[in-house]
């Protein structure tokens, strides 16, 4: 079945994989599961538009971390974290800018956030990055409890109308 194939392909625990009606649905489910109106969630300035939309539906505050030259700034994300922060949404590689932050910066981000803050790592376009400095998120999900990785079949496999995402 599909979940077993995903688990085998990405070396993930099949019991931690969920399928959804595209990444959009999974982003909304995550926001609704973890956010209350008194919470905050961080997203990047030029990130995926579904992030602030999903946050706002919950009544939580969407906090923007400014990019630098259209590239995610880990320092700016870290500077926006406070006691109300519950989620950080990060698209890497980023849509719509096409930029990505290297593995070292992703690891620095994750090791610098409080353990009660969840990093939602949207790697929808990961197959397009052919560089050893990139991390697709599988390693983070296998190592840490506060990371959720999102992927989709729509982009790489030409299945946009199918709306099939997983996390």
Predicted regions and their residues:
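PLP-dependent aminotransferase class I/II
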Residues: 1, 146-167
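Phosphate-binding glycine-rich loop
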Residues: 2-40
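A general structural signal for well-ordered alpha-helical segments in protein cores
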Residues: 2-3, 27, 51, 74, ...
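Short glycine/serine/threonine/alanine-rich loop segments
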Residues: 12, 60, 117
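PLP-dependent aminotransferase-like
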Residues: 16, 33-90
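Structural detector of well-ordered beta-strand residues that form the stable sheet scaffold
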Residues: 18, 42, 63, 120, ...
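Active-site pre-lysine segment of PLP-dependent enzymes
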Residues: 56, 74-83, 96-119, 123-156
